[in-house]
């Protein structure tokens, strides 16, 4: 592309304004954003929402169409954790489920677009050069944690990250 696209916040803001015709959302938890209520409102405001997901979620409940995708145990791939570290994983179970990549490629083909992706190696070839970036990085506003509730005598608070944060 000749122009920079929108980041997640930009896409959600555009959806909330009615500037997008549709949203395709994959594996997003609204609680990962600084303002989950704004994310819910933006998704609800989008005229058409497609969700690619392995389980029921707030997004799937708001979606017009939910397309199931293979969970990590049924495909090869790589997670990029919040620190930007690559965490590759292999397929543990043989299944016939479609991967996120397969579903996205088929959706694009239906709309007459060629993503240029025929194999997982195509994604690696495009993404790997980005991992070695040494230039300036985007500045992100810090997001504080919610206050820890008070605890009384003999009580405890369990504070844990979501599963697979560091997968």
Predicted features, each with a name:
Residues 1-96, 103-110, 121-167:
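A cross-kingdom feature strongest in bacterial/archaeal respiratory oxidoreductases
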Residues 111-115:
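Short, hydrophobic alpha-helical segments
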């Amino acid at each position: 592309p000749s122009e920079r696209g929108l980041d997640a916040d930009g896409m959600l803001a555009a959806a909330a304004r009615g500037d997008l015709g549709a949203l395709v959302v994959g594996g997003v938890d609204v609680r990962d954003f600084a303002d989950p209520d704004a994310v819910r409102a933006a998704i609800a405001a989008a005229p058409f929402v497609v969700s690619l997901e392995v389980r029921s979620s707030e997004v799937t409940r708001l979606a017009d169409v939910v397309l199931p995708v293979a969970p990590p145990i049924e495909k090869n791939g790589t997670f990029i954790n919040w620190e930007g570290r690559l965490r590759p994983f292999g397929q543990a179970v043989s299944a016939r489920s479609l991967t996120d990549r397969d579903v996205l490629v088929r959706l694009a083909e239906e709309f007459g677009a060629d993503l240029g992706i025929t194999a997982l190696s195509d994604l690696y070839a495009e993404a790997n050069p980005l991992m070695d970036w040494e230039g300036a990085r985007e500045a992100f506003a810090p997001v504080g944690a919610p206050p820890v509730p008070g605890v009384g005598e003999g009580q405890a608070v369990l504070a844990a990250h979501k599963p697979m944060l560091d997968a």
